[in-house]
Amino acid sequence: MAVETVVATPEDNDPWINAQRQFDAAADVLHLEPGIRAILREPQRELSVNFPVRMDDGSVEVFRGYRVQHNVNRGPAKGGIRFHPQVTLNEVRALSMWMTWKCAVAGIPFGGAKGGVIVDPGRLSHDELERLTRRYATEISLLIGADRDIPAPDVNTTPEVMAWIMDTVSMSEGYSIPAVVTGKPLSVGGSEGRNAATGRGCAMVAHQVCARLGLDPRRLTAAVQGFGNVGSIAARLMARDGFSIRAVSDAYGGIHSEVALDIPAVVEHTRRTGSVVGFPGARPVTNAELLELPVDVLVPAALENQITAANAGRVQATLVLEGANGPTTPDAEEILVRRGVTVVPDIVTNAGGVIVSYFEWVQDLQSFFWSEREINERLGRILTRAFDASWEASERLGVSLRLGAYAVAVQRVAEATSDRGIFP
């Protein structure tokens, strides 16, 4: 495979510009009516908040957070909350738009939203993290609600964080509202299968695309960037299903082996040490190096903007499964597609999380819960429909798999927008 070298521009790494470029490409293919196009190209609501938190030493620090609702024409807004020092408004805007398309291509009745706080949670004590979470939840309570906007876990947020948000909103209203967030512990209305849903969905999509391409997973090597909730579960399930996982990484670095890694052992090593780094029998690699390893399948499952125009020409994998949101920039994807690389987009690959969040929301509203087996069966059916619709649109329109998925999603949201009309 030929190597291309391109210098990335600043715009190439702005997630909001990239999200709008992806939307514009789909709007062009669909010949979207100008008014609908203008509506869908921008977020519907944006809330920026600056809020104080009392620290353990008695001092007060002020944090900035966001909640953005991109579109609610197909139902309540849905999207995670991330705690990260590099959160920006443009990032949250992009993530909210991607959630709109993700829910639409999956055929679940939600619009898209996202939230974030600019903070390094690793430097907070447990009590400080709880106080920050509860104050942020109070600040965005103007927007969130079980029938308005339902948050969920994302980067550096956990089921415990979701329980704090649920409790904060419930205390404000005077009664328990479990459906206000998803991704909660089972004890307070969480769903079986939710914690593993995104990684499980990624592994399911890996099998679906292999079937379409006539590939045998048992003959394929893979590398997974990001060994958190999504990447570790995807790696474990893909290894179980026959893929030879040769490399994994986390925020501290990565490991690579010439033979298949023992993923359960890597998980245990990470539990004990806090990182995959130093796993016995594997050589160290950086996150950047992992993306360019000689493997068949690459699963970027960390943060956005990992595969850019600057390194896309050196990616050796022939199949990219986007476990993270926005890991491949539009310019990078053009290079990959030109080189014959199949890219399965994030709005399909990592949709398992929001699909099972939908199940959790439905179960909370009905106070009737399903078994993990029932959850996983329903997840498989919905993901298969979403993948098949995207693949068939790609072939029908003669476009990339991402553009096929976007065409399906944007068309569904455009139809809902048109059918509802313009108020007043």
Predicted regions and their residues:
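Adenosine-phosphate binding glycine-rich loop
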Residues: V7-D14, V209-C210, R314-P424
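Glycine-rich phosphate/diphosphate-binding loop of Rossmann-like nucleotide-binding domains
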Residues: P185, G190-E292
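Rossmann-like adenosine-cofactor binding region
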Residues: G253-V343, V348
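Short, Gly/Pro- and small/polar-rich lid/capping loops
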Residues: V6-N50
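Glycine-rich, N-terminal phosphate-binding loop and its surrounding beta-alpha-beta segment
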Residues: V49-P121
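Glycine/serine-rich phosphate-binding loop and adjoining beta1-alpha1 elements at the start
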Residues: H84, A104-R218
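Flexible, glycine/charged-enriched surface loops at secondary-structure junctions
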Residues: E33-I39, G107, I144-P153, Y175-A179, ...
